């Protein structure tokens, strides 16, 4: 009787371990190089912009029901289509999902329908560590005169980020959104976290947790696991944006996680074309498709004229920052946080392609974009 009891104990203990491990066993695995490259071979060369409708100051104003502006979205995506763009990088927000998950997912579906009419497949961003660390639902404040991206908010905010007891909220959001659209061919990819360890040194540094990097090192792998548990047919990524990428050994710890967890690689580069190409070549050592999900800062040396031909040569996806100069005011340089452009405008636009009426900032630029994309 004692032997039988012990056997039963071992059986139940083994079953318990299996049940605990089951979610991980059932979760989708990291894509192999072959799968990632096979997927990319079937895609047209991705070229587009980071998109926020000109009537929104941030992600919350874009997606909340009261300010969701389909007319502007349709009009501005039409301008993007007209110059050959076929993707947009679009930021979501966990607070909007928590407020009304079904309503938010319906608005995402509406956005996807509009984008599809313009032959655009977006990359959706779930979390973002840049700018204001205290997002609040409701009416958003007006743009601060003369200041670049004066209303953009982080997702999640500091209050959630530094409290692990609230992480189940983030897990529900990731699994909810990715799960709802896991099989949607209108979506190109999921960018799980934008610049995760950005400390916002020149803007909101005092509002960020002092141990932000440590927090993100523990949280980002969980976010990848949550997204994989939803079994998306689209690839997952999180973009490298600083550090030495010569090898995994020289990379910051967070960058290693991004490389090792991403199905396709992505990165940001706002520097000269020589630097852009150098970073492309460094990432090619990992033998996976590459997207540049942020570039084009004219005053810093990153331009359509010089970067797009390099991206096309290496078949690296190219997604510049900014489409239409609107409430985000990203045509203003980063240094506007120290010196607002109130009484004068910058000598050259920092980001963005179109004026509010659809007129290109530089006609030659849109001709270059159209020329490069027409030769896909």
Question: Where on the chain are the PLM-derived regions?
Answer:
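Active-site mouth of glycoside hydrolases
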Residues: 29-262, 268, 273-274, 286, ...
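The feature captures the conserved acid-bearing segment of alpha/beta-hydrolase catalytic domains
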Residues: 276-284
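Bacterial N-terminal signal peptides that target proteins for export
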Residues: 2-13
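Carbohydrate-binding surfaces of carbohydrate-active enzymes
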Residues: 363-376
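Short, surface-exposed amphipathic charged segments that create phosphate/polyanion-binding patches used
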Residues: 333-337
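Bacterial N-terminal signal peptides
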Residues: 11-24
